Amino acid sequence: MLIVLQPLANILNLDRLLEKPHTTEQISSLWTAYHASRSKGTGRGFICASVPLDIYNKMMATGMKYPAFAVPLPRDAVQDDSGQAKRAYEFYFLQWGFHKAPQTPTPSILFSKPPAGVSVSNPQTSTVLLTPLQEYKSRTTFATPYLILTFYADLASSHGLILLRGEITPTAASAANNPSSDFLLSQQDAQLLTMQLQRFYLWGGEGEGVKERHRLLEAFHNTPEEFKWEDLLKHAEPV
C-alpha cells in the first residue's frame, strides 16, 4: 500500500505561523481548530491530536521494531447458533511507514523556546495505514487503507511537539459527489483504531494488560505459531 505524503506546509501556513512566537498549547489549538473546520465545518473525515515528542519517540521505536500488526474493532452483537447474542469484532491490519526527517521550519529564531531536553534535530515523520484484514488478505498491496495516520515531526525540535493527522478514506460516491458525505469508516471507529495503536505501541506501566499486549506484539512477529487471535479480543474494548 503506497501513499503520497502531504507536507505539513500544505496543511498549515507555516510562514504565517512563523511571524510570531507560538507556544505548544497555541499550536495544538490551531491544529484542532483547523480540522474542526474541514468538511463544511463538520470536521468529518478527520481526526487530529498533538503528541509530546517523548511519547512519539517511544511509539516510533516500537513501530520500527514491529512495523505490522492487527487490532480488533468491536462491532454490534450477532446471534450464535444457540440464539445467544455474542459480541462481534472486525480485525484491522496496520502498517507503519517511515519517511525522511523534515527540516525545522525557518526562521526558527521567532519560535518560542523548545522544552528542556528537546533534540536539535527532528525525528522521522511516520505514517500508519489501517485496513480491514479481509480487505488486505484479498488485495494485499492493492488494498485500500480506511484510515491513514500521519505523525508530522516538523515542529519536534522547536516545540517538542508532533502533530497527528488522521484521514478517513471517503467512499467512491462521496469522493465524486460530496466529499463531506460518506466515509469508509465512522469517526468513532477511527478514534478507536487510533487508541488501539497507542495501547499496543506505547508501553507504559507494569500491569498485566501492558505485559500481555507487549507479548502479543512480539509473538505476531517472532513466534507466529504462538500467536492467538482470541487473545487480542481481551484488549478490544475501549478503556
Indicate residue ranges for each PLM-predicted region.
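Charge-rich, low-complexity N-terminal segments
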Residues: 1-96
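Extended amphipathic alpha-helical regions
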Residues: 65-233
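Long, charged/polar, low-complexity intrinsically disordered N-terminal extensions
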Residues: 235-239
